[in-house]
């Protein structure tokens, strides 16, 4: 297993906020190199890559709010492992302090160092669950007062941490509640004739548990439900799930967590409610039409079109648009962004029309030719509440160790189109 040699938290200006060395002293050159690399990318107004290379070591870095988390390593390390460690560090700090910004880190450096020391022991990941860490590391004084006012206990036995490391034993609520939110993230590519060329749906079961004690829950799905490429939270009883694929038995963490993630082929699911027609026309003209064929309104709809040359004019029937010039070339290319706050299912088709300027005869000429570039594709993004693309359905949620108690509050579904592309005719 790869080891974590050091952890650095720096702000957007490169100032060091926190430093933890888990395997002895690291060279001061490491921190200086991190600062120099980040400053170099900042001068170019570019976001640095996840991995920064040096002849003696690698630096893994990621920006969260206004704090950059950096982990250097001198040996071969799996990037996904480091990324998972980073996400868990961010989740823990957010759980304790409500955010991961520079001001919160500066005010709570001592507690964060204690948390990191418990999470990383001599370079190895040990206790990474926020609920378990709350039993080990004392909460800040403000949080202690808040928990006292709300009636939550701060002194708990360590037995629960040993048996169920992902759940704190001090969970106590006046009313027991359990919420489920299924997020379906769609990635798809459509051909010019409107037919699907490729598509996948990645679904996450986001849960929020507010149940006192140590509940044992049984989530029953619609009979015959099969979850493809599924990844469960460590609390799930896999033995029972293998015997009964439509039942999920688990002891939930306290608060928010992802119970399961699974992926399905979009071709076997329902079609998207938003239909897009994109056409190249004569003399540099192009047209985009959007229709809502579903029964619910689509929110925060956004169309992104890559424009390969100068843009003369744009007209839209609804919404706003903006043209963003490319940061990486001196040409007149860029991204045309069309935003619509809400597209009701009763609305007529929305239309965007535009005109491209003629191409230059050559790179050094100011004269225009009679030829035009053709647009290749556009990207669609939107959010649709209360709808689902597959037949996934929760039938019931029972508390096995307390059958008389009811905590289930229902399921909410959201479709998020984040990587959906339509090719122009």
Swiss-Prot record:
The primary gene name is apm3
Protein's membrane topology = Peripheral membrane protein
Q: Cross-referenced SUPFAM superfamilies, in alphabetical order? A: Second domain of Mu2 adaptin subunit (ap50) of ap2 adaptor, SNARE-like
Please give the biological process terms from Gene Ontology that the record holds: endocytosis; Golgi to vacuole transport; intracellular protein transport
InterPro entries linked to this entry = Adaptor_comp_med_subunit, AP2_Mu_C_sf, Clathrin_mu, Longin-like_dom_sf, MHD
Q: Which GO terms describe its molecular function?
A: clathrin binding
Family, according to the entry, reads as follows: Belongs to the adaptor complexes medium subunit family.
Q: What does this protein do?
A: Part of the AP-3 complex, an adaptor-related complex which is not clathrin-associated. The complex is associated with the Golgi region as well as more peripheral structures. It facilitates the budding of vesicles from the Golgi membrane and may be directly involved in trafficking to the vacuole.
Q: Where is the MHD domain?
A: 175-423
What does the organism's lineage look like at the top?
Answer: Eukaryota, Fungi, Dikarya, Ascomycota, Taphrinomycotina
Task: List the protein's name.
Answer: AP-3 complex subunit mu
Annotated coiled-coil positions are: none
UniProt source species: Schizosaccharomyces pombe (strain 972 / ATCC 24843) (Fission yeast)
